[in-house]
Amino acid sequence: MNPAIVVIIVLLVAALLIWACKAKKLDGLFNFGDPYYTSTVTPSVSPTTVLVTPPVPAAYPMYDVNYRYPFGVPWDIDVDRRRRYNWGRWRR
């Protein structure tokens, strides 16, 4: 087998292991701190289970606006401008 291919495979496996170890600390990065996504299941304490199980949401909703648009829905971007525009007209 080509030694370059072996080196690439070893590096990929090492990167995967590092990602699996750090995945517990990274799970807040992908769910934006939404308590809906925090898993309530604690895995049994064994090094293989903790290493292999990546952070998975407790349940996937059919359509979650926060998942699709984490920084707000695009049609609400101009709310402040609409409020400022309508401020003088609310008496009519």
From Swiss-Prot:
Record's keyword terms, sorted: Signal
Region forming the signal peptide: 1-23
Protein name: Uncharacterized protein 312R
Organism listed in the record: Invertebrate iridescent virus 6 (IIV-6)
